[in-house]
Amino acid sequence: MGVYLEDVDEDNGPMMVIPGSHKTGVIDHHSEGYFCGAIDPIKTPMAFSQAVPLTGAAGTITLHHVRSVHGSALNRSAKPRRLLLQGYFSADAWPLNGFRNGQSIDDFDALIVRGVSTLEPRLANIPVKMPFPKALHQGSIYENQQTLKNRYFGSMGPNKRVTK
């Protein structure tokens, strides 16, 4: 869920989402063998030109499926584009990668908004690609994405055609 803290129009780089892309299956988010949290538009057959801008006034809420191909367009204005992002998941959707930075099950449970703590993670027959090996320069998701040479959102831009 995103909440715009500023008015967001097509000039100051709105969140862009490709409708229906969450139904295409797992997309590789690796660059040169390492997880980077972004996809290469040249290697990924996706209708990037179909990305829809999510514009709105400050206070607008945006929602999209976590597997939807999404990203922010370049901010081509002098206006800021602050966005508060909040993720929600089921109480039984444990991090398969384990807890990080010394976190424990108690820390995980403290985040429960609705539901009950469980020691039985839900495992469904869905494709999952683990984020291994970790990025060479592990940092924020935005830092990790910088290792990908071909990025549609934020570099190649929604107004530029991706060519193979």
What feature does the model see in each segment?
Residues 8-73, 93:
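Double-stranded beta-helix
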